[in-house]
């Protein structure tokens, strides 16, 4: 059986994935808020969890710092900083421990020259450049579609770069979560119930990246389908 998807089918698939992503994102925020109220049995703050994880992995040149916002936590390989939102940095709860350990997972990847993180870091400025101009070329492409397909094809090439970036992000995020979960369990940062909650939250976080990659891919295929159909006509 052959499955033939046209650009309309791909459009609805993209919209469907978008709404599923919104639901998952809301569930993630809800769980983070819920687990933020659950006191951690070990009594450690997110900052203490992060510092301990870095030290036990022999990483002493990475700083743990506090930043503003909600779910703004990230690791910066350029400045070598684990940036934790204020609630995570000071929090003594399951959510804070899970998020802090996850971001330290990225620092460990950097320290061990994890190939996918290395590639993603190289691609970050390229992706930023592509993202800056892709909307312009895609809009221009649709405006000029009856005159020339070149602007739209350039937009598609730029969009392909950002799509590739979303897929490169998947192994990076999944590996960081696995490192985090293994470490917090082995080092008794969490008890059994807390571990299940941490795993649940990190799974939802990973799902947001999977859905983002799928949405980007289906939109890319839709744009390619539009160009191909114009060429056939």
Specify the residue positions occupied by each region the protein language model found:
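Hydrophobic alpha-helical transmembrane segments of integral membrane proteins
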Residues: 14, 134, 148, 155, ...
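Hydrophobic transmembrane alpha-helical segments that form the core helix bundle
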Residues: 126-177
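Membrane-interfacial hairpin junctions
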Residues: 1-3, 143-149, 231
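Short, flexible micro-motifs
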Residues: 13, 24, 49, 144, ...
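Hydrophobic alpha-helical transmembrane segments of small proteolipidic membrane proteins, enriched
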Residues: 1-31, 141, 153-154
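Polar-ligand-bearing catalytic/cofactor-coordination segments
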Residues: 2-4, 26-130, 164-233
């Amino acid at each position: 059986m052959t499955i033939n998807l046209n650009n309309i089918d791909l459009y609805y698939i993209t919209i469907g994935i978008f709404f599923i992503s919104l639901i998952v994102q809301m569930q993630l925020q809800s769980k983070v808020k819920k687990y933020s109220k659950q006191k951690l049995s070990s009594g450690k703050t997110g900052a203490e969890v992060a510092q301990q994880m870095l030290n036990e992995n022999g990483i002493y040149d990475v700083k743990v710092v506090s930043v503003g916002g909600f779910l703004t936590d990230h690791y910066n390989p350029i400045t070598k900083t684990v940036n934790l939102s204020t609630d995570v940095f000071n929090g003594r709860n399951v959510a804070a421990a899970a998020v802090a350990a996850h971001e330290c997972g990225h620092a460990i990847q950097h320290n061990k020259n994890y190939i996918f993180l290395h590639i993603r870091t190289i691609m970050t400025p390229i992706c930023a450049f592509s993202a800056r101009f892709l909307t312009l070329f895609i809009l221009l492409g649709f405006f000029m579609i009856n005159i020339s397909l070149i602007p739209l094809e350039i937009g598609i090439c730029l969009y392909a770069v950002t799509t590739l970036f979303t897929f490169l992000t998947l192994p990076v995020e999944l590996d960081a979560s696995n490192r985090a979960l293994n470490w917090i369990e082995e080092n008794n940062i969490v008890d059994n119930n807390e571990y299940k909650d941490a795993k649940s939250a990190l799974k939802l976080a990973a799902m947001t990246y999977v859905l983002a990659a799928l949405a980007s891919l289906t939109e890319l295929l839709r744009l390619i389908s539009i160009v191909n159909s114009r060429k056939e006509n």
